[in-house]
């Protein structure tokens, strides 16, 4: 059996590339050995930036790919993967148009979504806004395309003088080009200990399918890697990892306190950078404190609604009642909220937080959170079109990569992850990659 390309991994990048490639008239074999297990795409927030999209313009938002790049470079100075950043920024509005116009994706702009590090509102998603809903739409879309053959098998591949032989279907497939689109290595304890020792043993709230296998195939062929210590942390994860609060609460005025009832971090540094800070506190936990007025703005936030339904959110009519429920020092918590009120009125925050949306008032809300590893940012280094690069900088013939197994947009540690980077790389680099195939 002959196909033009084989794609390993049916996450965001893999399914996007498959759709974009078939739209160019290419035949695709899409392999997903973990089809019955939720991948990172399915458990993500399902949010991606598309700076300069027509949907933003229709909402009166003045944005551009360059503005998003400026935000990325300011948020992660010296940590941006400049090989792909410009092309990804320019590709994201095109990728969004393709999904909506070419695939009838029910995507929409989220004018109320505020994210740390972004100076404009530029997030897009599906209705309802969740990774589960977006993943389900993509799965249905790829399986409806006759040019995309779907295989729930672990493929074995060998290089040939021209192209590749892929064994994972009923017959051995002959393909011209290979796209590695598997997950990262967040569920591979040995790789985490080697490359991100500070998160060794931390809660992994990413998919168990992130075993590093797609990356290993590229390494076997001499691929170069980049940013292997970079990762997306999640500082709003409820202990146990089944639910999380989402990233919006600090932007709306929420705070984090430790078991002593004291703030310990500027909460607006972003959800990723918060993860190691939360883990550094006693017990590796923090209490996220907000109020009913903030909760009222989270009706469309899927992650928060899941946590609320799971009983992870406390409600209290006063500071002392909340302190009693949470088991923190009431006097310290009251003093903390007084300090927050002063900062929201213009006083400089000693921890360096730049903005407090408002002071908090009863009825109060709170939830215990911990720091977790959501997904890794390092991976196979590519050029701007997703071609995998060898250790000497030359292009690896016929091999492309995008998604979790490929080098991300920015890294070192958790601080370089700008919210939305994961799906931005998957769709933006995926678009460039698909145009380069053939």
Please name every model-derived segment.
Residues 215-217, 221-332:
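An anion/pyrophosphate-binding glycine-rich loop and adjacent beta-alpha core
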Residues 33-153, 256-257, 263:
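Conserved N-terminal/central alpha/beta ligand/cofactor-binding core
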Residues 2-3, 169-177:
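Core beta-strand elements of the Rossmann-like FAD/NAD(P) dinucleotide-binding domain
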């Amino acid at each position: 059996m002959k196909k033009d390309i084989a794609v390993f991994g049916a996450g965001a990048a893999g399914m996007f590339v498959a759709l974009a490639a078939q739209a160019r008239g290419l035949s695709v074999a899409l392999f997903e050995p973990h089809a019955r297990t939720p991948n990172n795409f399915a458990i993500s927030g399902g949010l991606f930036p598309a700076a300069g999209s027509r949907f933003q313009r229709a909402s009166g938002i003045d944005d551009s790919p360059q503005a998003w790049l400026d935000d990325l470079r300011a948020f992660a100075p010296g940590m941006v993967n400049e090989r792909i950043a410009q092309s990804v920024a320019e590709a994201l509005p095109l990728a969004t148009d393709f999904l909506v116009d070419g695939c009838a994706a029910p995507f929409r702009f989220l004018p109320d979504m505020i994210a740390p590090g972004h100076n404009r509102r530029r997030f897009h998603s599906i209705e309802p806004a969740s990774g589960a809903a977006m993943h389900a739409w993509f799965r249905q879309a790829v399986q409806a395309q006759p040019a995309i053959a779907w295989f729930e098998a672990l493929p074995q591949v060998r290089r040939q003088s021209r192209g590749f032989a892929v064994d994972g279907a009923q017959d051995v497939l002959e393909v011209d080009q290979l796209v590695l689109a598997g997950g990262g290595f967040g569920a591979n304890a040995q790789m985490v200990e080697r490359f991100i020792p500070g998160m060794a043993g931390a809660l992994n709230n990413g998919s168990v399918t992130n075993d590093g296998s797609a990356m290993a195939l590229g390494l076997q062929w001499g691929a170069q890697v980049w940013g292997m210590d970079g990762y997306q942390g999640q500082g709003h994860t409820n202990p146990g990892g089944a639910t999380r609060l989402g990233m919006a609460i600090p932007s709306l005025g929420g705070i984090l306190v430790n078991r002593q009832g004291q703030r310990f971090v500027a909460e607006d540094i972003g959800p990723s950078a918060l993860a190691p800070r939360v883990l550094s506190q006693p017990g590796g936990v923090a209490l996220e404190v907000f109020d009913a007025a903030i909760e009222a703005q989270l009706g469309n936030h899927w992650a928060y609604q899941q946590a609320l339904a799971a009983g992870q959110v406390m409600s209290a009519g006063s500071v002392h009642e909340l302190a009693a429920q949470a088991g923190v020092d009431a006097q310290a918590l009251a003093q903390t909220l007084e300090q927050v009120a002063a900062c929201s009125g213009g006083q400089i925050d000693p921890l360096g937080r730049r903005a407090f949306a408002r002071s908090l008032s009863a009825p109060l809300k709170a939830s215990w959170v911990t720091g977790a590893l959501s997904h890794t940012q390092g991976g196979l280094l590519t050029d701007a079109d997703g071609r995998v690069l060898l250790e000497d900088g030359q292009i690896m013939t016929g091999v492309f990569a995008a998604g979790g197994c490929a080098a991300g947009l920015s890294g070192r540690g958790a601080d370089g992850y700008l919210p939305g980077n994961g799906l931005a790389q998957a769709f933006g680099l995926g678009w460039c990659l698909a145009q380069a195939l053939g």
